[in-house]
Amino acid sequence: MTGAGTPSQGKKNTTTHTKCRRCGEKSYHTKKKVCSSCGFGASAKRRDYEWQGKTGDN
């Protein structure tokens, strides 16, 4: 019977995110091949959302 306790945490030693070639952030998912910051790998367009700006900025 294995759980999600302290012994299981020692297995979490794989690198998930590496440096992105396009934006330079440490957000490029090596298994998914997609950057969570700029969207590199998923589309040619930059990842950008309306909710990213400050509230009240028009």
From Swiss-Prot:
Domain of life assignment: Archaea
A molecular-function term among this protein's GO annotations: rRNA binding
Residue stretches of biased makeup (Polar residues): 1-17
Binding site for Zn(2+): 20, 23, 35, 38
Pfam families (alphabetical): Ribosomal_L37e (PF01907)
Cofactor: Zn(2+)
Keyword RNA-binding: yes
Cofactor: record remark: Binds 1 zinc ion per subunit.
UniProtKB keywords: Metal-binding, Ribonucleoprotein, Ribosomal protein, RNA-binding, rRNA-binding, Zinc, Zinc-finger
Cellular compartments per GO CC: ribonucleoprotein complex; ribosome
SUPFAM superfamilies referenced in this protein's UniProt entry, alphabetically: Zn-binding ribosomal proteins
The protein's role, per its UniProt record: Binds to the 23S rRNA.
Protein's name in the database: Large ribosomal subunit protein eL37
Lineage: Archaea, Methanobacteriati, Methanobacteriota, Stenosarchaea group, Halobacteria
